[in-house]
Curated annotation (Swiss-Prot):
Subunit structure: Interacts with the primer terminal protein; this interaction allows the initiation of TP-primed DNA replication at both viral DNA ends. Interacts with DNA.
GO molecular function, one term: DNA binding
Site (Probably involved in binding template-primer structures): 252, 387, 391, 434, 438, 498, 500
Entry domain remark: The N-terminus contains the 3'-5' exonuclease activity and strand displacement ability. The conserved motif YxGG/A located between the 3'-5' exonuclease and polymerization domains is important for DNA-binding, coordination between DNA synthesis and degradation and for the formation of a stable complex between TP and the DNA polymerase. The C-terminus is involved in the protein-primed initiation, DNA polymerization and pyrophosphorolytic activities. The YCDTD motif is essential for the pyrophosphorolytic activity.
Pfam families: DNA_pol_B_2
Reported impact of residue 254 to F: Decreased dNTP binding affinity. 10-fold reduced affinity for the correct nucleotide
Protein name: DNA polymerase
Natural source organism: Bacillus phage phi29 (Bacteriophage phi-29)
């Protein structure tokens, strides 16, 4: 007998903001495939009664928040955590880092069929705020606003304005998810959707052949060479007000490397000592020990994490008299040799790889075409597909999660679950895609050494208003891998990585403000970029007060309390 496909719902809670009275004052749910089926109510008990009987897949946007209320309720109503799918238990996927992916509530079995409702996080499929989804996806409804701090006692009657706000919220996510599902994007995360899309194009059989599963031991060694984006502030400009400058960023930096660069495939061969050129295995990861000093006039490129001798986020000018232990892709190693003088070098061992170009060509061509010929939702989905794939290759095989429990004070606590691993995807690919991305940004920045202020993954920030020679022939607002002229600023101030302000030249075109130049600007936009700073705090920033030590007690911090989660005002300080 064929079972009916499971229904899917977009859900949302509105909650009180007091530590001593933490509860859900309103809920909403809407059928993702039939927006006329929805309900908005004011009782968590009523919502959970529906959850236990609906046997559907539910989506909350930021399950880490709303899920805490659900697990509080389950724990207080006879449900216990279990990984074994027993009746009247629930299971979770919560990562070691506290990322929530799923709550699976099991009611029992009908024959062999599990009777359960599964709750997912739509934020993992659509990693944007609801307001941005509505705007970028050009949906029929836009996100509204309500007073979150208003007194709402138990049994509070929802006002028409609040009702409309909740309905809008669940409908925005319902519409966006439906578009994804219609495109066949039905996995738990954007990365999984992207990987599935890639496998569909090259076939699972070819994928397994080209990207074999490496042993956990081999994967661990490869992973030592895996690094993120290049984010660096030139000391020369740190904490100073700077005059005019320009920002350029690479169009789709990671897909551009995937499209054209030499990338690894197949089983690696382990070698001892120093890599010797092998045309069949032209890429390699080298394990070396050495001391190093930055050459005069060069940008530092080496970070050493997990070491007691060095700050993990600092690009080093010197090894400081210590022997540094490094695993580097040949791309990173060549860059290091160009930028540093190396001393007492010991080549220990390494891994070499077969390599080719074009593995991702069909996938990137498909989604780039969709991106450039579509508007709204489909355009955003194409961007998501293009940008979510590379990270999936380097997924950590250690998937040991956290298990929730109710503490004595009635709030949720979390303990580390049993150690759990999964097969790695193909980490060498992640290593080389990110290495080529750093190479792209660093070589462009180095060629503008006398002008470079700051680099952030795919962008370079320069003094002056002339396009530098190194990129002048590859500037285009849309072409894959070209540099787009992002903005020109009148003045700026940079304090540290991901912490800077700019007065940006703007001009009016067809009633809209767009980036301008010193010659044609009609307005100035004050832009604040600061990791961890909320929009509310950004409104307090000026050129005068933007410095190390700037502090405001206005940053909402989630705190687990009896009943669920409350956002309490915490202090944000630029350190």
């Amino acid at each position: 007998m064929k079972h009916m496909p499971r229904k899917m719902y977009s859900c949302d809670f509105e909650t009180t903001t007091k530590v001593e009275d933490c509860r859900v004052w309103a809920y909403g749910y809407m059928n993702i495939e039939d927006h006329s089926e929805y309900k908005i109510g004011n009782s968590l008990d009523e919502f959970m009664a529906w959850v236990l009987k609906v046997q559907a897949d539910l989506y909350f946007h930021n399950l880490k928040f709303d899920g805490a209320f659900i697990i509080n309720w389950l724990e207080r109503n006879g449900f216990k955590w279990s990984a074994d799918g027993l009746p009247n238990t629930y299971n979770t996927i919560i990562s070691r880092m506290g990322q929530w992916y799923m709550i699976d509530i099991c009611l029992g079995y009908k024959g062999k069929r599990k009777i359960h409702t599964v709750i997912y996080d739509s934020l993992k499929k659509l990693p944007f705020p609801v307001k941005k989804i509505a705007k970028d996806f050009k949906l029929t409804v836009l996100k509204g606003d309500i007073d979150y701090h208003k007194e709402r006692p138990v049994g509070y009657k929802i006002t028409p304005e609040e009702y409309a706000y909740i309905k809008n919220d669940i409908q925005i996510i319902a519409e966006a998810l439906l578009i994804q599902f219609k495109q066949g994007l039905d996995r738990m995360t954007a990365g999984s959707d992207s990987l599935k899309g890639f496998k569909d194009i090259i076939t699972t059989k070819k994928f397994k052949k080209v990207f074999p599963t490496l042993s956990l031991g081999l994967d661990k060694e490869v992973r030592y060479a895996y690094r993120g984006g290049f984010t660096w502030l030139n000391d020369r400009f740190k904490e100073k007000e700077i005059g005019e400058g320009m920002v350029f960023d690479v169009n789709s930096l990671y897909p551009a490397q995937m499209y054209s660069r030499l990338l690894p495939y197949g089983e690696p061969i382990v070698f001892e000592g120093k890599y010797v050129w092998d045309e069949d295995y032209p890429l390699h990861i080298q394990h070396i020990r050495c001391e190093f000093e930055l050459k005069e006039g060069y940008i530092p490129t080496i970070q050493i994490k997990r070491s007691r001798f060095y700050k993990g986020n600092e690009y080093l000018k010197s090894s400081g008299g210590e022997i540094a232990d490094l695993w580097l892709s040949n791309v990173d190693l060549e860059l290091m040799k160009e930028h540093y003088d190396l001393y007492n070098v010991e080549y220990i061992s390494g891994l070499k790889f077969k390599a080719t170009t074009g593995l991702f060509k069909d996938f990137i061509d498909k989604w780039t075409y969709i991106k450039t010929t579509s508007e709204g939702a489909i355009k955003q989905l194409a961007k998501l597909m293009l940008n979510s794939l590379y990270g999936k290759f380097a997924s950590n095989p250690d998937v040991t999660g956290k298990v929730p429990y109710l503490k004595e004070n009635g709030a949720l606590g979390f303990r580390l679950g049993e150690e759990e691993t999964k097969d790695p995807v193909y980490t060498p690919m992640g290593v080389f895609i990110t290495a080529w991305a750093r190479y792209t940004t660093i070589t462009a920045a180095q060629a503008c050494y006398d002008r470079i202020i700051y680099c952030d993954t795919d962008s370079i920030h320069l003094t002056g208003t002339e396009i530098p020679d190194v990129i002048k022939d590859i500037v285009d607002p849309k072409k894959l891998g070209y540099w787009a002229h992002e903005s020109t600023f009148k003045r700026a101030k940079y304090l540290r990585q991901k912490t800077y302000i700019q007065d940006i030249y703007m001009k009016e075109v067809d009633g809209k403000l767009v980036e301008g130049s010193p010659d044609d600007y009609t307005d100035i936009k004050f832009s604040v970029k600061c990791a961890g700073m909320t929009d509310k705090i950004k409104k307090e920033v000026t050129f005068e007060n933007f410095k190390v030590g700037f502090s405001r007690k206005m940053k909402p911090k989630p705190v687990q309390v009896p009943g669920g989660v409350v956002l309490v005002d915490d202090t944000f300080t630029i350190k």
